[in-house]
A protein has these predicted regions:
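Long amphipathic N-terminal alpha/beta scaffold segment
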Residues: 16-76
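Active-site-proximal loop/helix of nucleotide/amide-processing enzymes and allied scaffolds
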Residues: 1-26, 46, 66-68, 78, ...
């Protein structure tokens, strides 16, 4: 079992490292964003809007935070269809666990330009929040990006 656990940990570390490098390549300003302290939904919007700019498909991203709410990394979990981005809690928390995140923030875009959360958005958020409670990694917010606007599900009492 010990050797199997070692293999699994090496796989997870390689996967997170690959995703992390992929994220940096997508956003060359990431080095500056890694030290961002998140105090409000607008901090997320201002610092990570470039991940969603000009996207024609939904993109679902998870920000990993330390105990001081400083971003220690992020991962693009899925890129979906024109109006949906399917994701599962295990994908959301895999990188957060390996990176020893204290908490996470979810973010995705609506290419339609409408920042209102859909029923699917609310449902998956609730599912991920409950999963986070079970494993001890709280979800602070779910931000929906749309053009030059955003909606915080936490501000609406949905997180």
């Amino acid at each position: 079992i010990t050797s199997q656990l070692g293999v699994l940990m090496r796989y997870c570390i390689r996967t997170v490292t690959w995703r992390f490098k992929e994220s940096i390549e997508l956003d060359p300003e990431f080095v500056n964003k890694r030290s961002v302290v998140i105090r409000s939904p607008s901090d997320v919007f201002e610092n990570y809007q470039s991940l969603f700019k000009d996207q024609v498909r939904e993109r679902f991203v998870v920000l990993w935070l330390n105990s001081a709410n400083k971003v220690i990394g992020f991962e693009i979990i899925t890129e979906g269809l024109l109006n949906s981005s399917l994701t599962h809690p295990r994908e959301v928390f895999r990188g957060a666990i390996v990176s020893t995140s204290a908490s996470i923030i979810l973010a995705h875009n609506h290419p339609s330009g409408n920042p209102e959360p859909s029923q699917e958005d609310i449902s998956i958020t609730k599912q991920i929040v409950e999963s986070g409670k079970i494993i001890g990694i709280p979800v602070h917010d779910h931000i929906i990006f749309a053009d030059n606007n955003f909606t915080s599900l936490a501000e609406r009492g949905l997180v």
